[in-house]
Amino acid sequence: MKQAASLGVVVLAGLMLSGGLALAQDDASVPEPSGTDAAVEVKAASYVEQTTIGDMFEVESSELALRKSGNPQVRAFAQHMIADHATSSHELKQALSAAKVDAPVPTALDGEHQELLNTLQASTGADFDRNYLKMQMDGHQKALQTQVDYRLHGGNKELQDFATKATTMVQTHLSELGKISQGALLSQ
């Protein structure tokens, strides 16, 4: 008898709880579920924007390094960044086309990256090299997170495949940065 009474209390509590939840969720407060394609496109659009702006910054800041740096290690790294990130941008556009996702591709830096570029333009000598290498390290760490996040959680296979390849590239750049940062800064 005690078990039946206990079961009755549990069932009653469950009904009250579910009834309370049902009352709390009227039709006006429950958002309509968005389509899977829309959710994927939003995520893909954000990924494409972050990756494209990152590539543009790497190329533009590295072109500046070729003009302003006198350090051969910094200049060699900058040349490598221009080549790799130009290739990355091209491959991203190909993946985006294959993915058939309508995601706008930025054509200019955002405000944050333009400010960083302005800081570099105002720098000279050893300060330029330090700023450039620090910005490269910071930018590549952010890029790595972006690539890994999309590779693991993105909703489009073509873009995930690109993110996998880009992850390897960014990891290589971070490794190179670790090596040349020490040498470049110690030799000044």
Residue ranges and their predicted role:
Residues K2-V11, S18-Q188:
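His/Met- and acidic-residue-enriched segments that coordinate or traffic transition-metal cofactors
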